[in-house]
Swiss-Prot record:
It comes from Dictyostelium discoideum (Social amoeba). The gene is rbsk. Homodimer. The active site is at 270 (proton acceptor). Its EC number is 2.7.1.15. It comes from the Eukaryota. Catalyzes the phosphorylation of ribose at O-5 in a reaction requiring ATP and magnesium. The resulting D-ribose-5-phosphate can then be used either for sythesis of nucleotides, histidine, and tryptophan, or as a component of the pentose phosphate pathway. Activated by a monovalent cation that binds near, but not in, the active site. The most likely occupant of the site in vivo is potassium. Ion binding induces a conformational change that may alter substrate affinity. It holds the Pfam family PfkB. This is Ribokinase.
Length: 318
């Protein structure tokens, strides 16, 4: 389907606990509020892109429990194609507990549940869908074998571009194999430094602070190392984003145009990625413009509580 985005990965049922400060080990504290929301990186990214008007298909697996039933209804309400959302019996849906402090920072504990049962056959069932998409978007929350398989299938097609959100990062060799099939890599600063250190056996950078030029040089070296990368995008929170491309004339630091009052940063990275995919694929904007537009969407999300509940629709973007 023309300008179609397919997302492979995890769906979660999120429980948010709000606190004034994070508890220390062994400490019991009183929370200030509790909310539930839909989550999971793949689900979040698909929902945000769909809210902005993209045609999105999600490949994920749910449990046959109340949270799974509600999650499936949520996808349908958000106009996501659920043809490849499968349901498994006697296994709980994925879930996450998210602790958010008064500054909007968070700690997260994830239980994979049904997400851990997403398999290569599920991806094979969606082969035609993937290969006829304009973009395949993946993360690392489900089996790495499944993610690798999806990326390989996508690159068998000349049409489908691939985007990998390298989180949660680890040092599994399968990730290096994935890089052979990735066009656009998206990382945050910590993930970039971790990837750079493991790639170049550099153990001296873990505690250092890096300036923008040093981070861009890391990206440039990674693009030279992994020749399939066309672009690396680095999210820097309140400091904006970096774009580093094979075409060096596109390299830039995109700073935030306005500061906002942060309430909750949960899911903001997914909001940015889903929005970026939308603007790049559906609206066919250039890379830099897509990043700027996505940054604006994500900056709205951090002014609201929750993950998907914080995501703006297209008519809320000025």
């Amino acid at each position: 389907m023309e300008n179609n985005i397919t997302v492979v990965g995890a769906s979660n049922w999120d429980t948010f606990i709000y606190v004034d400060k994070m508890p220390r080990v062994g400490e019991t504290i009183k929370g200030t509020d509790l909310k539930v929301s839909y989550g999971g990186k793949a689900a979040n990214q698909a929902v945000q892109a769909s809210l902005l008007g993209s045609n999105c298909t999600l490949i994920t697996k749910l449990g046959d429990d109340p949270s799974g039933v509600n999650t499936l209804k949520n996808f349908k309400d958000k106009n996501i194609n659920c043809e490849f959302v499968s349901v498994v019996s006697n296994v709980p849906s994925g879930c996450a507990t998210i602790i958010v402090d008064k500054n909007g920072d968070n700690n997260i504990i994830i239980i994979g549940g049904s997400n851990d049962l997403l398999n290569e056959k599920d991806v094979d069932n969606a082969k035609s869908q993937i290969q006829n998409s304009s973009l395949l978007l993946c993360q690392l929350e489900v089996s790495l074998n499944v993610t690798l398989h999806a990326l390989k299938i996508a690159k068998e097609s000349n049409k489908c571009k691939t985007m990998l959100n390298l989180t949660p990062i680890n040092n599994d060799p399968l990730i290096l194999e994935m890089f052979k099939f990735v066009d656009i890599l998206i990382v945050n600063e910590i993930e970039l430094i971790g990837l750079y250190n493991s790639t170049f056996n550099n153990n001296n950078n873990n505690e250092k602070d890096f300036n923008i030029n040093q981070l861009m040089e890391m990206c440039d070296n990674l693009i030279k190392k992994f020749e399939n990368f066309e672009n690396i995008i680095v999210t820097l929170g309140g400091n904006g984003q970096l774009l580093v491309s094979k075409e060096n004339n596109k390299n830039c630091h995109i700073e935030l145009k306005e500061k906002v009052k942060v309430v909750d940063t949960s899911g903001a990275g997914d909001s940015f990625i889903g929005s970026f995919a939308h603007y790049l694929v559906t609206e066919n904007k250039p890379l830099k413009d897509s990043i700027e537009s996505a940054s604006k969407v994500a900056s709205i999300s951090v002014t609201r509580h929750g993950t998907q509940t914080s995501y703006p629709k297209s008519n809320e973007i000025n």
